[in-house]
Amino acid sequence: MHNQLLDRSTTTPAAQARHSSRGPEGGRRQFRVSVSGRIGAPPVQVYAVIADYREHHPRIVPPEYFRRLDVLEGGVGAGTRTQIEMRVLGVTRVFEQVVTEPQPGRVLMETNQDGSAVTTFTVQPAGTYAATQLTITTDITARPGLAGFVERLFTSAMLRRIYQKEFARLAEYMDHRAHFGLVEESLPWL
């Protein structure tokens, strides 16, 4: 099975940033970065890789940005707690996330412990069940004023770049697993 982001229009996943109105945090604004693309593997297999923070998820995050991804609790799906160390443009940031599954097998969410960012992975069939349409969306609470404006511009661009690399790594990882017969046909926890 060949995995890639299909056709020229989706080779680089479609991305958008949306800015919303003032939030409840004293003038802070919410903004969204969303990237979608097609992966040439069944949704159940793609979801299994994304939801497994012990074995698979660390292999798809771009190592040039993600220095560490440690599982503090759980490890697969809802209830997983992670600590992540990221380095972007020379700045290192460590934060904890909690994983929930509003729709197990289809929607997985990572929420920063302080609530400042929520990343949602949405997996659905792309045409047939042999391919997946994956959307990664992050909703972020920005600071007010000029600092928040700069933060929105910078963060939107960086997240798009990170997610495009994550898509490429996921497609390559799914190819590797299919080539060596390492895919699960069903997942008992779904």
Where are these regions (language model features)?
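Short beta-strand segments that buttress and anchor functional surface loops
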Residues: R81-R87, V107-Q113
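Beta-strand/loop substructures that line and gate deep hydrophobic ligand-binding cavities in soluble
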Residues: G27, M109-K165, L170, G181-V183
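Hydrophobic/aromatic beta-strand elements that line small-molecule binding cavities or substrate pockets
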Residues: V35-G37, V71, F95-E101, V118-P125, ...
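A short, structured loop/turn motif at beta-sheet edges
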Residues: P43-V44, G74-G77, E101-G105, T122-Q133
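Hydrophobic ligand-binding cavity/cleft-lining segments
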Residues: H2-E73, L190
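Short, flexible loop/turn segments with low-complexity composition
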Residues: H179-L190
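Beta-strand elements of well-folded, non-transmembrane domains
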Residues: I39-A41, V88-G90, E101, I140-P144
